[in-house]
Structure formats: structure tokens, C-alpha cells
Amino acid sequence: MINISGHLREERKITGYCNQDVPLIVNCCGKQVFQTQDYFCNRKNGRLDYQIIYIHRGSGHFYLNNEWITLSAGNIVLYRPGIPQYYSYYAKEKPEIYWIHFTGNECENILKQYDI
């Protein structure tokens, strides 16, 4: 796997960060390319922040609305805070994804403004 990422803080938490003192702030973002190893994410309690995943190439498998679905290149997934996150990538499908985690007191209003 190729993993390129940037993080706001030195300390990284699997649960992410919540900051309601600012309108919007990016906690971390990155790109991952899965070439030889499969990847499985199992976050039963979700995270404290929002997450957007963009599938640039290949596909990803996501458990959404009580069913597994396969999303191909060009699709985006949004996870709100506290929403369980179950997803996987299979190296044979050559997934290349971009992701971002963000938080803030205006996040939900911004998403609503764009009907998201």
C-alpha cells in the first residue's frame, strides 16, 4: 500500500478529533493506493469527525444502509460523526482513494447548503 497523508496534530487518534470552537478545520487528508494488500476498516462507533472518501480508481466496498455496496471510480462516500464505518478495498481491484477528515461547528450547515 502507498499511503501519503498530512495531519494537523502530531498525535493521531483512531477516533479522530472534534473541535466545535472553529467553523471548519481539516484534521487530516491523504491518498492511498492498494497494490498488494487488502484493507478492511471496522469502526463500530465511527469517528468524532467527518470523513469523505473519493474513489479515484478501482473500487471500494462499503456497508451503507444495512447492505454491502460496491462503488467504482468517481464515487464519494461521506461519513458523519458517530456513524459506523465498515468498508474494504481489495488489491486485485487496484483501488486508489483520496480521503479527508474534518470537524467544526459549521460543517453540517455547509453540507446542507450544498444538499449533502
Model-predicted segments: where are they?
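Generic protein-terminus/edge-of-domain signal
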Residues: M1-T70, I76, E108
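Amphipathic alpha-helical segments enriched in hydrophobic/aromatic residues interleaved with Lys/Arg
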Residues: E108-I116
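Ligand-binding loop in jelly-roll beta-barrel domains
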Residues: W68, G82-E106
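Protein kinase-like catalytic core scaffold
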Residues: N75-V77, Y98
